[in-house]
């Protein structure tokens, strides 16, 4: 403490965190220095912590957008607030990592009430039919095949179907009352299919990604409200 006081402008006071060892006792006695005062708790206090102010985010944004925001701000935690700025919870990198582990439930997107706009944004795609502000609330996610018989047997009403460019396959999915069709690899969709989708209130999303990439990325479109921490938060005003 004496040396630090000589080297800098700040004031230091000698303290000890436990019993004095024999070696330290010898040095203190030799130089006739009083024993440093004992400190029983060296835990950090709020005044010792550097606080970074981070703007709150909506609970409706996608996991992908939350992750991109974390990387941009170089943080591992984001506060989630409502429209009035009141804290609803926090989302951390662990929460996002956990969401990637739930890959065996093909209805997880509808259970999370995922907005089609989020899905298109996550897939870097465009919504060319249907209401982008609507939500996927029922059904499962299906990777379609070119076999029309398979589609008729496997696709159920309200399902979300990932398809290729085949017009007849897209029409069969619409006839099966799919709620959303995702067309990959940047393929264009026939105007007849778009018109039919609008009549059936079916959303069509086109994306440059291939089928594998779509299936891998699509879960990142879920809203963070399903994964954020809401309880046991210690909060305070500053």
Language-model regions: role of each:
Residues 134-198, 202-207:
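Extracellular/luminal Protease-associated
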Residues 106, 199-229:
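Long, charge-dense
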Residues 22-31, 194-199, 218-220:
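Active-site-proximal loop->helix
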Residues 21-22, 44-45, 188-194, 211-215:
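Short gly/pro/ser/thr-enriched loop/turn and capping motifs at secondary-structure boundaries
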Residues 93-109:
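A short, polar/charged loop-to-alpha-helix boundary motif
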Residues 37-69, 81, 87, 116-129, ...:
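Bateman/CBS regulatory modules and CBS-like beta-alpha motifs in cytosolic regions of diverse proteins
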């Amino acid at each position: 403490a004496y040396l630090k006081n000589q080297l800098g402008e700040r004031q230091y006071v000698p303290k000890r965190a436990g019993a004095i060892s024999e070696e330290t006792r010898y040095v203190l006695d030799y130089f006739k220095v009083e024993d440093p005062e004992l400190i029983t708790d060296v835990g950090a206090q709020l005044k010792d912590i550097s606080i970074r102010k981070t703007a709150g985010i909506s609970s409706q944004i996608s996991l992908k957008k939350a992750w991109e925001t974390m990387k941009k701000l170089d943080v591992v935690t984001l506060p989630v607030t409502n429209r009035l700025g009141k804290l609803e919870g926090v989302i951390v990198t662990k929460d996002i990592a956990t969401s990637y582990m739930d890959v065996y439930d093909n209805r997880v997107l509808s259970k999370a009430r995922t907005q089609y706009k989020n899905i298109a944004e996550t897939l870097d795609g465009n919504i060319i039919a249907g209401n982008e502000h609507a939500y996927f609330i029922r059904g499962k996610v299906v990777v379609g095949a070119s076999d029309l018989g398979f589609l008729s047997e496997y696709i159920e009403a309200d399902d979300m179907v990932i398809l290729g460019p085949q017009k007849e396959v897209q029409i069969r999915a619409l006839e099966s009352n799919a709620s959303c069709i995702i067309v990959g690899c940047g393929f264009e969709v026939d105007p007849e299919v778009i018109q039919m989708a609008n009549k059936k209130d079916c959303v069509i999303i086109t994306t440059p990604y291939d089928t594998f990439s779509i299936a891998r990325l699509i879960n990142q479109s879920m809203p963070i409200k399903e994964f954020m921490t809401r309880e046991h938060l210690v909060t305070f005003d500053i």
